[in-house]
């Protein structure tokens, strides 16, 4: 199977170079707004590619404010293998470090209903974080079921199912260097 046939049902929405430019711009904004001793909480699995690029962009952008983030991961599940939200969020794997008294930046792939990020934010708040901000690569407007917004947004996208750059459909397509859309049933 060639790469072209493997991806015949994926339409490119945002190219790799557009993503790179936007991640750099986001990092430049983030370093002016947040303290250098950040705790980054990356929500797995969808945000691992975005987080990996964002922390390096933060390093490059943060020469002046001396940013030195710590990174931790939490696996939350709300979708399972389907493309429709099950409505409840569960911790599949928890953080390894305490967030008490820390300035936390939660990083996620996409803000849709807002259930995942509401759950993560409330949990981290309950655990005594000093401050909490949210950065998402993508957001879909008009889909929110919870009153939550991200402080830093990469791209606002139409109401289609996005894959690539860490985002999946049935745990496939995460490796794509661009963001594409697929038809889901
Ligand atoms: P929310 O809880 O509905 O805001 O959805 C957040 C989670 O659902 C994200 O972290 C993704 O894992 C998943 N999700 C929502 N929309 C998409 C999409 O278009 N493509 C891939 N995953 C998505
Ligand atoms: Mg996710």
Regions found by a protein language model. Give the residues of each.
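PRPP-associated nucleotide enzymes
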Residues: 1-185
């Amino acid at each position: 199977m060639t790469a072209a046939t493997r991806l015949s049902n994926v339409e490119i929405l945002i190219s790799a170079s557009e993503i790179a430019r936007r991640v750099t711009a986001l990092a430049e904004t983030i370093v002016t707004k947040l303290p250098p001793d950040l705790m980054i909480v990356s929500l797995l699995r969808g945000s691992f590619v975005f987080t990996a690029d964002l922390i390096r962009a933060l390093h490059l952008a943060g020469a002046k404010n001396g940013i030195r983030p710590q990174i931790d991961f939490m696996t939350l599940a709300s979708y399972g293998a389907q493309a429709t939200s099950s409505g409840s969020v569960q911790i599949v794997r928890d953080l390894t470090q305490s967030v008490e008294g820390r300035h936390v930046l939660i990083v996620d792939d996409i803000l849709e209903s807002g259930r995942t990020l509401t759950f993560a934010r409330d949990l981290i708040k309950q655990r005594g974080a000093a401050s909490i901000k949210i950065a998402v690569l993508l957001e879909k407007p008009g889909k929110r079921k919870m009153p939550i917004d991200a402080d830093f947004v990469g791209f606002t996208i139409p109401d289609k199912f996005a894959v690539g750059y860490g985002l999946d459909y049935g745990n496939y397509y995460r490796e794509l260097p661009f963001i594409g859309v697929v038809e889901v049933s």
